[in-house]
A protein has these predicted regions:
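Glycine/charged-rich beta-loop-alpha catalytic/anionic-binding loops adjacent to active sites
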Residues: 30-34, 52-66, 106-108, 225-233
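Short beta-strand segments
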Residues: 66, 95-101, 127, 267-270
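Flexible, glycine-rich active-site loops centered on histidine and acidic residues
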Residues: 84-121
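Conserved active-site "lid/cap" helical segment
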Residues: 1-30, 43, 109, 158-204, ...
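Condensing-enzyme catalytic core mediating Claisen C-C bond formation in acyl metabolism
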Residues: 1-6, 109-183, 270, 283
Length: 283
C-alpha cells in the first residue's frame, strides 16, 4: 500500500472504475457486496459499509462475506441470489462487488510459507439484473460448499482477543500448512465438475484461484483441458490476492485476444475456510 492508501480507498477507487466501465451511475447502485478477511483497519465495520460511505451511497444494502480465498466467488453467489430475489419481486437492481485483502499486514516476513506467496490488492465488478445491460458476462451458475470441519488448522488467523485472554503478547499472524492446502486443493478439484454439472470443458477458459502453480496445473488432467485454457499468470506475476484472485484474472484475460476464443468462463476458488466456490459465466 502506498502513502495514504488502505484497503477501503483501493476498494473505493476500484468500484468507481468498475461503474465507469459498466456505464452505471452511483444513483443506480442498490448495494455493495464485499469479501474481505479481517485485514482492514477495523474488524467492524466491514469493507462493504465503509466503501459505501466513501462513495457517499446511502440507504443501500452493504454485506460482507469473509470466506478466505473462496470469498470472492461466494460473495458473487450471495449477490446473484439477491438479484434472483429482487427479480422475483419485479425489482431491477445493480450491485457492486468488491473483494480483496491487505494481507501483508498479517504475514510473518520471515516465513517462507506465507511471506513470498500472498499479495495485497482489490477487485471490483458490477452485477445487475437489468435486461438492458450490455457487454460483460451472464452468470449461468454459482455454487459453493464448506469443508472446514475436516481440518481447520490448515490455514488460520488467530483471534487477537482470544490470544490476549490466553496470555499471549505476540502478534497474531497468518499460519498455513502448505502440504495440507495442496492436498485439499487437488482432492477437491473433481468435485468442481459436480458442482457445476459439467463434464466437457472444451468451450471453457478456466480461471482458478491463484494459490500454487502445481495445484493449478492439476486441473489440466482433471478437466481434460489444454494448458492454454488455464489461467496461471496471477500467481506468477502478482501472487495470491485472496478472494480477488479470480476476478483479477478475469480482468487480465479480457484485455487479451485469447479471451475471444472461448464462450464460457469457469471461476473456481478454494480458501482458508476450506471452502470451494465455483461460477460459470457466458457471453
Amino acid at each position: 500500500m502506498g502513502p495514504g492508501e488502505n484497503l477501503v480507498t483501493l476498494a473505493r477507487d476500484a468500484a468507481r472504475d468498475a461503474l465507469k466501465n459498466a456505464g452505471v451511475e452511483l444513483s443506480q447502485v442498490s448495494g455493495i457486496f464485499s469479501s474481505c478477511n479481517p485485514t482492514t483497519d477495523y474488524l467492524m465495520p466491514t469493507l462493504a459499509p465503509m466503501v459505501a460511505a466513501k462513495l457517499d451511497i446511502k440507504h443501500v444494502l452493504a454485506c460482507n462475506v469473509g470466506m478466505g480465498c473462496a470469498g470472492g466467488v461466494q460473495a458473487l453467489q450471495a449477490c446473484f441470489n439477491q438479484l434472483l430475489a429482487d427479480s422475483a419481486r419485479g425489482k431491477v437492481s445493480t450491485y457492486i462487488l468488491v473483494t480483496g485483502d491487505h494481507i501483508s499486514r498479517m504475514l510473518d516476513p520471515e516465513s517462507w510459507k506465507t511471506a513470498i506467496l500472498f499479495s495485497d490488492g482489490i477487485s471490483a465488478v458490477v452485477v445487475t439484473n437489468n435486461p438492458e445491460a450490455t457487454g460483460g458476462f451472464v452468470i449461468e451458475h454459482v455454487a459453493s460448499e464448506c469443508y472446514a470441519g475436516e481440518e481447520v488448522a490448515v490455514i488460520n488467523l488467530p483471534n487477537p482477543l482470544a490470544a490476549r485472554e490466553a496470555g499471549s503478547t505476540g502478534p497474531c499472524l497468518l499460519q498455513m500448512r502448505g502440504r495440507g492446502v495442496f492436498e485439499f486443493g487437488t482432492r477437491i478439484a473433481p468435485r468442481v465438475k459436480e458442482l457445476v454439472g459439467i463434464t466437457n470443458f472444451e468451450e471453457f477458459y478456466v480461471i482458478p484461484h491463484q494459490a500454487n502453480i502445481r495445484m493449478i496445473n492439476e486441473l489440466i488432467p482433471t478437466f481434460d483441458i489444454k494448458p492454454e485454457q488455464l489461467y496461471v499468470d496471477g500467481i506468477t506475476k502478482i501472487g495470491n490476492i485472496s478472494g480477488a484472485a479470480c476476478f483479477l484474472g478475469l480482468e487480465d484475460i479480457m484485455s487479451r485476444p485469447l479471451a475471444n476464443n472461448y464462450d464460457k468462463i469457469l471461476l473456481c476458488a478454494f480458501g482458508a475456510e476450506l471452502q470451494v466456490a465455483v461460477a460459470v459465466l457466458s457471453r
